[in-house]
UniProtKB/Swiss-Prot annotation:
Gene that this polypeptide is encoded by: add
E.C. code: 3.5.4.4
Active site feature: 200
Highest classification ranks of the organism: Bacteria, Pseudomonadati, Pseudomonadota, Gammaproteobacteria, Enterobacterales
Residues that bind Zn(2+): 12, 14, 197, 278
CDD domains: ADA
Binding site for substrate: 14, 16, 170, 279
GO terms for biological process, alphabetical: adenosine catabolic process; hypoxanthine salvage; inosine biosynthetic process; nucleotide metabolic process; purine ribonucleoside monophosphate biosynthetic process
Record note on cofactor: Binds 1 zinc ion per subunit.
Record's protein name: Adenosine deaminase
Length: 334
């Protein structure tokens, strides 16, 4: 269930993993690209998960058509705006949208800084039109290597006022967090908050690395934390939140089934964990599905689902005053 008295949040939601199939079709035609299909129904299997993928990298390949059609900065602005519209229509009161400017720029060699500007502009327009609070998290795409990530970081820091936090995502096994220490040192020095994808494809050592070497305040996915009791204790004691993405973890074969997902274990251990989507358009789900279908299937009680909902706001990269303003907006006390 979703408690209507609490703000509904999604703090692990990829902007470049939530490009509508119709938009892919529209932009593909606009830029005269050879798409795998020219009709919406036949395009969907190429851009949306239809079966469990064998691993994370295979899952991520489903995102490629979404960014392949970004032939201009206006296209980037459009998908950013549509992401805000989708979040509002999903019933969210607050979301943190993360994006990799290098990944979005790569196919058509767009200026990376221009992509950051376009995304910030599209988000700002969407927030005005749809009355929702959205913050942006910049992603360093580890898959493209250290130099590409430096370019991303430079572009994100050039627009520091529009970026709330920094994330590291991509091929966790091939590109460990230790390669990106200097990137995250710079980000922290600039005042960015830190979240890191870890413990999804790699083991608990990747989570320790994210915390100790990159300064992670939150962990994306983090399912492998359950394999290390000391790590579980540390996460609970230091209130390092886990951004859980239930359906995604099944689709990437990170977890065998919802029944074996560790989210309930995290909550019962006192870890601040929340419920999120990940890549809604690619997954074919929205936040309501995660609360109403996935969370009960993962063994969460109604009380634990409510706790996870409250945790989403507690974990948010905004001030306590902003959190209280959201609470008051959703459930004003006369």
């Amino acid at each position: 269930m979703i408690d209507p008295r609490l703000p509904l949040t999604d703090i692990h939601r990829h902007l470049d993993g939530n490009i509508r199939a119709q938009t892919i079709l529209d932009l593909g035609q606009q830029f005269n690209l050879n798409l795998p299909a020219n009709e919406l129904d036949t395009l969907r299997p190429h851009v949306q998960i239809t079966k469990t993928e064998p691993d994370l990298v295979s899952f991520l390949q489903k995102l490629d058509w979404g960014v392949a059609v970004l032939g201009s900065l206006d296209a980037c602005r459009r998908v950013a705006y549509e992401n805000v519209e989708d979040a509002a229509h999903a019933g969210l009161h607050y979301a943190e949208l993360r994006f990799s400017p290098f990944y979005m720029a790569m196919k058509h060699q767009l200026p990376i800084t221009g992509v950051v500007e376009a995304v910030i502009d599209g988000i700002a327009s969407g927030c005005r039109d749809f009355n929702i609070d959205i913050r942006l998290i910049g992603i360093l795409s580890r898959t493209f290597g250290e130099q590409a990530c430096l370019q991303e970081l430079d572009s994100l820091l050039a627009h520091r006022e529009g970026i709330t936090a920094l994330d590291l995502a991509g091929d966790e096994l091939g590109f460990p967090g230790s390669l990106f220490r200097r990137h995250f040192n710079r980000a922290r020095d600039a005042g960015l908050r830190i979240t890191v994808h870890a413990g999804e494809a790699a083991g608990p050592e990747s989570i320790w690395q994210a915390i100790r070497e990159l300064g992670a305040e939150r962990i994306g996915h983090g399912v492998k934390a359950v394999e290390d009791r000391k790590l579980m204790d540390y996460l609970a004691e230091h209130k390092i939140g886990i951004e859980s993405c239930l359906t995604s973890n099944i689709q990437t074969s990170t977890v065998v089934s919802l029944a074996t997902h560790p989210l309930a274990t995290f909550l019962r251990h006192g870890i601040v964990a929340s419920i999120n989507t990940d890549d809604p358009a690619v997954q074919g789900i929205e936040i309501a599905h995660e609360y109403l279908v996935a969370a009960p299937a993962a063994g969460l009680t109604p009380h634990e689902i409510r706790q996870a909902q409250a945790n989403g706001l507690e974990m948010a990269f905004i001030s306590e005053q902003e959190k209280q303003a959201l609470r008051d907006k959703v459930f004003p006390i006369s």
